[in-house]
Amino acid sequence: MGLSDGEWQSVLNVWGKVEADLAGHGQEILIRLFTAHPETLEKFDKFKNLKTPDEMKASEDLKKHGVTVLTALGGILKKKGQHEAEIKPLAQSHATKHKIPVKYLEFISGAIIHVLQSKHPGDFGADAQGAMSKALELFRNDIAAKYKELGFQG
């Protein structure tokens, strides 16, 4: 399930584009997540009242959370699969405090792929999409394993 060096390079190349505008990418990814899967909004007290994409775009809290999410994910991706230290506290908080099901991590992975494809078509072709999908699946599988250790059935 691991990625080749070339695949990791592809992931990190496009991630450099994300880091150039964490707020913009994070906002778009969360809006995509919440509009495609409105049930995910229920896990976010700060965002439950946001019903339209325009309301979501106007939310500074949503923008800040997008930066938080993508900063954490970037730190994990840069570890190229050697992310045990980063995954453990994330799994702990998402299992015990936030109670985020693995299915929702699949949903946000889809939102990430969609937004990167729309914002960076020249840098995110089929090979890059495949590499990112594998990297996100590796992340989800490792989170799911930690959830299991914690007794969370998410």
From Swiss-Prot:
GO terms assigned for molecular function: heme binding; metal ion binding; nitrite reductase activity; oxygen binding; oxygen carrier activity; peroxidase activity
Predominant location category: cytoplasm
Globin domain mapped to chain residues: 2-148
Cross-referenced SUPFAM superfamilies: Globin-like
Keyword Metal-binding: yes
Record EC number: 1.7.-.-, 1.11.1.-
One GO term (biological process): removal of superoxide radicals
Keyword Ion transport: no
Cellular localisation: Cytoplasm, Sarcoplasm
PROSITE patterns linked to this entry: GLOBIN (PS01033)
Record-listed Phosphothreonine modification sites: T68
Pfam families in UniProt: Globin
Reactions that this protein is recorded to catalyse: Fe(III)-heme b-[protein] + nitric oxide + H2O = Fe(II)-heme b-[protein] + nitrite + 2 H(+); H2O2 + AH2 = A + 2 H2O
Residues that bind nitrite: H65
Top-level taxon of origin: Eukaryota
Keyword annotations of the record: Cytoplasm, Heme, Iron, Metal-binding, Muscle protein, Oxidoreductase, Oxygen transport, Phosphoprotein, Transport
GO-annotated cellular components: extracellular exosome; sarcoplasm
Residues binding heme b, per UniProt: H94
Residues involved in O2 binding: H65
Function: Monomeric heme protein which primary function is to store oxygen and facilitate its diffusion within muscle tissues. Reversibly binds oxygen through a pentacoordinated heme iron and enables its timely and efficient release as needed during periods of heightened demand. Depending on the oxidative conditions of tissues and cells, and in addition to its ability to bind oxygen, it also has a nitrite reductase activity whereby it regulates the production of bioactive nitric oxide.
Family the UniProt entry places it in: Belongs to the globin family.
Oligomer and partners: Monomeric.
Protein name in the entry: Myoglobin
Gene: MB
